[in-house]
Amino acid sequence: MIVIGRSIVHPYITNEYEPFAAEKQQILSIMAGNQEIYSFRTSDELSFDLNLRVNIITSALELFQSGFQFRTFQQSFCNPQYWKRTSLGGFELLPNIPPSIAIQDIFKNGKLYGTECATAMIIIFYKALLSLYEKETFNRLFANLLLYTWDYDQDLKLITKTGGDLVPGDLVYFKNPQVNPATIEWQGENTIYLGNFFFYGHGVGVKTKEEIIYALNERRVPYAFISAFLTDTITRIDSRLMSYHASPSTPQTSIGFIPIRDDAIVATVGNTTTVY
């Protein structure tokens, strides 16, 4: 269900020739048909969320095709022209290097980088926002970047919730409870849901849910009897907060609305929204 202000609406793309129009319409249809409530104050916020999701998906595919390597933190490496490898295996932005250039280099020269899956997901989030922000804004927000697992910049606002409906552009986690300790890095897989039943995970590539579970199951202890599984934990960029920094020059998606109800009372507690 999609709510704009106090109105429950069914949105649709009005310009079928705009970039990724079909993908955007699919996302809107999924959100409108889900039981979960997606609440926005304005249509511009919905447009930002929609474009953010598309950019997360395209950034995930770009990273997949970049040659970016899968490595444990003990074996991680980065381009020393832009980053310093920390003692824990993270990547620390060098002084006087704009974060926008350093993030773009990961996608341009992926073979010069290697790390594990959680860091890869955060890199994808930064790249998606870079596509929607002025470079000056991005550099101001994310100065002194450190890329290391979930230690992301305080100005990157994320929402993690349990339960809810899966939407393309969501980050979801596969858990492998009986992983072989010799390959503990396969205790789970962070992935971006690409839509059409496909996920991207750094290390497994672009695969279906069943294929990712199979890959994780291959890395269990001998005689394991518990299968890997897709958890119900979903992580998203808080598009309502992050939309404040969007570039005025970023093209807006033209969205029309079929009104369903215009007197909804919306209440949000934590990350749960209810409509009365």
From Swiss-Prot:
It holds the Pfam family TGL. One of its GO terms (biological process) is sporulation resulting in formation of a cellular spore. Keywords: Acyltransferase, Sporulation, Transferase. Disulfide bonds: none annotated. The keyword 4Fe-4S does not apply. Its EC number is 2.3.2.13. It is an enzyme of class 2 (transferase). GO terms for molecular function: protein-glutamine gamma-glutamyltransferase activity. It catalyses: L-glutaminyl-[protein] + L-lysyl-[protein] = [protein]-L-lysyl-N(6)-5-L-glutamyl-[protein] + NH4(+). Probably plays a role in the assembly of the spore coat proteins by catalyzing epsilon-(gamma-glutamyl)lysine cross-links. Belongs to the bacillus TGase family. This is Protein-glutamine gamma-glutamyltransferase. It comes from Bacillus anthracis. The lineage of its organism: Bacteria, Bacillati, Bacillota, Bacilli, Bacillales.
